Amino acid sequence: MLTKTKKEEKEFQKDSTTRSYWITTFGCQMNKADSERMAGTLEKMGYTRADDELNADLVLYNTCTIRDNAEHKVYSFLGRQAKRKHKIPSLKLVVAGCLAQQEGESLLRRVPELDLVMGPQHVNNLENLLGKVDLGNQVAATEETFISEDITNARRESSICGWVNIIYGCNERCSYCVVPSVRGKEQSRYPNAIKSEIQKLADDNFKEITLLGQNIDAYGRDLPGTTKEGRKENTLTDLLYYIHDINGISRIRFATSHPRYFSKRLIQACYELDKVCEHFHIPFQSGNDEILKQMSRGYNIKKYKNIIDNIRSLMPDASITADAIVAFPGETEQQYQDTLKLISDIGFDQVNTAAYSPRPNTPAAVWSNQLSEEVKKTRLQEINALVEKTARNRNQRYINNIESVLIEGLNPKNSSQIMGRTRTNRLTFVKIPKNIQFNFSLGDEIDVRINEARPFSLTGELC
């Protein structure tokens, strides 16, 4: 049980001008970007960041519901905070994100100590919602809405690499995925608003930006305008050309892509635009066509392989990463083996893996051919072993190469090393030389000779 001393309780009840907050983020990059914006809103309101959640006047959990283990963590955290609120009634408890959208008012009934439950579409309305809480209301904001253009300065976790949302929501209907029901329909931001945000990051000495979207290749489908060739006027490809020449930004990334919409025109743009990094995250989910059909993914393995071939024909050293699900309902041993074969055939740099987890309000959740937990565990262990082996083999190609590394900071586990990432998004540790003068700043790009490769990181020395 969380307890406070009398001194701590007195300190907690200090003047409201020194209110503090704590945000815990679960899940994807979109959630991380949302949390940065909510932190910016809170600081605009006069809150300061607490040193830990036990000292915060407001605690916010930005949640994920893509798998059930993420939900269990949230409820565990909420249980501890609910006990704390019984001792400190002025404590504000907020749940944001996908779990909040999924559960809505039922979450308020399950955890009555909560003050505010808000879905992802309401991130930019946090200040107004907290105003309602201050009037004594318990608030649930989960109705579908147009996402207002964010005018709040985000509190960025990095001073070098910035997230930039370009499209919200998802119109796909994958049979296993809860995202469309909790993130809403696709809503693209206008190019000029995106460019303005990136320009502000450049003015603040950011060097790298990552464009974000649940289905980023869908960017612009909902915006007006059609070219004389009959395609949409504003696409991800067009946006890359539009933002490429912003001075100060040296690296551009984007995620997450959908194979159904990954075009040759986009690949050509990535090849031509030297700021766009040679790293592509393109989930395949299964290596079997029948399972892909059951998943309602809208492509087959031949199409997926063609995309990878087209990328590597122009950028042979490009990093290819992906997502995969094992033990989908009805998946046979042979269909599972097809997934392992695809990983071996393509040679991914990394694959994020998960055993299938039934999610509320998705078609696959109610199918009768669910696989056992034992099968899920076995297949997940096997695929993870293969992914690690493949990643280790892929990273061997960097040995003795000279790679450009963007410095992000000191290695928190080894103060004699700095750390950063290559253009292909390989985490790289660099030993700080003792026998020569070496001055560096965050955001510098340095040439590093790679001398050690592990499955998910590299180590090297200054050239």
From Swiss-Prot:
Free-text remark on how the cofactor is bound:
Binds 2 [4Fe-4S] clusters. One cluster is coordinated with 3 cysteines and an exchangeable S-adenosyl-L-methionine.
Cofactor(s) listed in the protein's UniProt record? [4Fe-4S] cluster
Entry's PROSITE patterns? MTTASE_N, MTTASE_RADICAL, RADICAL_SAM, TRAM
User: InterPro entries attached here?
Assistant: Elp3/MiaA/NifB-like_rSAM (IPR006638), Methylthiotransferase (IPR005839), Methylthiotransferase_CS (IPR020612), Methylthiotransferase_N (IPR013848), Methylthiotransferase_N_sf (IPR038135), MiaB_methiolase (IPR006463), rSAM (IPR007197), rSAM_horseshoe (IPR023404)
Any Pfam family from its record, for instance, is: UPF0004
Q: What does this protein do?
A: Catalyzes the methylthiolation of N6-(dimethylallyl)adenosine (i(6)A), leading to the formation of 2-methylthio-N6-(dimethylallyl)adenosine (ms(2)i(6)A) at position 37 in tRNAs that read codons beginning with uridine.
What protein am I looking at? tRNA-2-methylthio-N(6)-dimethylallyladenosine synthase
Organism of derivation? Prochlorococcus marinus (strain MIT 9312)
